[in-house]
A protein has these predicted regions:
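Conserved AMP-binding/adenylation subdomain of ANL enzymes
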Residues: 70-87, 94-135, 149
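ANL superfamily adenylate-forming
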Residues: 2-43
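Conserved pre-ATP/AMP-binding loop-to-beta segment of ANL
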Residues: 32-51, 58, 81-87
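Conserved S/T- and glycine-rich ATP-binding loop of Class I adenylate-forming
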Residues: 46, 52-55, 88, 94, ...
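Short beta-strand->loop structural element characteristic of the AMP-binding/adenylate-forming
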Residues: 1, 9, 60-63, 90, ...
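Conserved beta-loop-beta connector loops within the AMP-binding
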Residues: 223-243
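Gly/Ser/Thr-rich phosphate-binding loop
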Residues: 133-138, 147-209, 218-221, 231
Length: 244
């Protein structure tokens, strides 16, 4: 009934029908191996296009190279101190740079990534407890809802850190989360789709400067500059410039 179907690739002939309709062509995967010259791939080649309106105000497609994705994963994994023992709960869309970064950092260090298509905020809390999650990333609208829930005390023994990006974390929400999860380290992050993350505020600095975007991620340089390109003074609004 698939009238538009033109090609079918069979990976394994076992269990496949001997006869096929004439409306489409059947190709055997094994017979195709080596028939097409291998294309040389370099780290500057495009790996993904992520769509965002965060940096310009208008939707656009951000082209990311393989090198860009790997570099972003390495930087985030370094300051979060990720290891193969970590278990990350992925609740954000993978089409979102913040969501995709959960997978890439897990792949980089060999950690476990648990995918969750949640309907209610409580589903997230239950999954953290059930899968003994060590790292959870979310955006402010979700954190606002999670801060109102009762977190099982057992979570305190394994939820090592939480991260926020995609907007500023309200102070009262952060206070509620820290009260509910006293042994969990919160990382407040700021970033552009082009760079995955640009800055992060270490947990040790939150009490001293809770409204700061923090410092540059590893292997990157950050400046806040005026229209003429000169560096801004502390507290002076300006344009964020990222290199790395």
């Amino acid at each position: 009934e698939c009238t538009d179907l033109q090609h079918v690739w069979e990976i394994d002939r076992k269990g496949a029908p001997e006869q096929h309709p004439d409306s489409y062509q059947v190709h055997l995967w094994n017979s195709m191996e080596g028939s097409t010259p291998a294309r040389r791939v370099i780290d500057a080649d495009m790996a993904a296009i992520l769509y965002t309106s965060g940096s310009t105000g208008k939707p656009k497609g951000v082209v990311l190279s393989h090198r860009n994705i790997v570099a972003g994963a390495r930087s985030v994994a370094e300051y979060l101190e990720l290891t193969e023992r970590d278990r990350l709960l992925c609740v954000l869309p993978l089409s979102f740079d913040y969501g995709l970064n959960q997978l890439t950092t897990a792949f980089l260090v060999g950690a476990s990534a648990v995918l969750l298509n949640h309907l209610f905020p409580k589903d997230v809390v239950d999954a953290v407890a059930r899968h003994r999650i060590t790292g959870l990333a979310a955006v402010p609208p979700l954190w606002i809802q999670l801060a109102e829930l009762n977190w099982p005390e057992s979570v305190r023994t394994h939820l090592r850190y939480i991260t926020n990006s995609g907007g500023a974390m309200p102070r009262e929400v952060l206070q509620k989360l820290r009260a509910a999860l006293p042994s969990t380290q919160p990382y407040l992050m700021y970033g552009l789709t082009e760079a995955f993350r640009s800055t992060y505020l270490p947990p040790s600095e939150i009490d001293r400067r809770p409204d700061s975007i923090g410092k540059a991620i590893p292997n990157a340089e950050i400046l806040v500059v005026r229209p003429d390109g000169t560096p801004c003074e502390p507290g002076e609004p300006g344009e964020l410039v990222h290199r790395g």
